[in-house]
Amino acid sequence: DILSGLVGSEMCIRDRVCTFPGWEAFRDESTVYTGSWTVGGPGGIKSPFTGKKTIRLVDLMHHRGGLVPDPQYPNATVAGELYLQNLDDISNRTDVIDRICRTPLMYAPHTERAYSDVDYMILGLIVEQVVGKRLDEYLQEGVYRRLGLERTGFRPLDIRTPPDLIAATELNGNTRDGNVGFGTRPDGSPVFIRTQTIRGQVQDEKAFYTMSGVSGHAGLFSTADDLGVLLQLMSNEGMYQGREYFPADVQRRFLTPDGDSATYGLGWRTNGYYYFHGGPSKAAFGHTGWTGTITMVDPIRDIQIVLLTNMRHSPVVEPPNEFAAGAFPLAHYVGLISRVYSALAEDGRVTDVDAPLPERAASSPTSSHRFRVVPRRRSSR
């Protein structure tokens, strides 16, 4: 199985980025300090850190590579020489690899844990190189189609998903209600930026403008039903309806906390009592999304939670990143998870006692991923 082979090798995830074909320039000598990313500039780079050639895939998965969190490649003012917009040619990955190789470090590698979109941009690009296919095609053929997922994928408008079935995100494109622009071209014309309500396109700027909508860090569209299947697959350690999609030990490796943090696995946030406190077992894991989403799996209690909101589809109240919907109760993910567990506990459906992980089931019922609201038991008082 390609998926198992891709993620199942300890040697693979410990390979250095610069050892992959096309990434030879991922070294300090290629770094440029430009735009907001000059040393001492507004981007926050305090020193010309070195050590790019030591960065491994596992460092990126743990967000310990030290790369600039958001280089803003499509913004000419911020990115400077790193500027890149590539809206239409998904097959052209050479230019974005070039920009990433020249992107400076914010911290010395392996010294700080800082979330960086670039980490998973790199991982997605390397997956494409390893499997010899675009990321969207590989996942569609190797995972989503096999699982029967009909509403999961990148660039949904390309597969004729009706726009009215897709939640809108920002009201005025990526302008933050007119507070943000992408600068000007050498001829004085403005750099392109979306100004209309975003619907059916990825909101993330780097994913849309630089990666043509297909990236390892953003751009995936789905539904609660489809995500329920994927979470059931994770809850069942790689098995779904009698088929193994990846070995259980691969998943356990991804959920093993990093040495100096109990809350970071490989791509997942782990340790339910810390990250999803207020009910989930210690085995719970999940992730949040900036646009207003969260997924959580509690394998001990066999609970999966999917929350898909379009929180950013609201006016900007404190430019450039605060939105009015941020004050809504649903915007506070951790509190919401706690409330779900409190309701289940009141109904007698969960307890506070952690139990061993259940035996890995050979299959899952086809209805296991369907979601419905369960009325709370009425009190006799």
What are these regions (language model features)?
Residues V127, M234, P299, L308-M311:
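Short beta-strand segments enriched in hydrophobic/aromatic residues
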Residues D1-D15:
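Single conserved hydrophobic/aromatic residue that forms the stacking wall/gate
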Residues V17-A284:
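Short, surface-exposed loop or secondary-structure junction motifs
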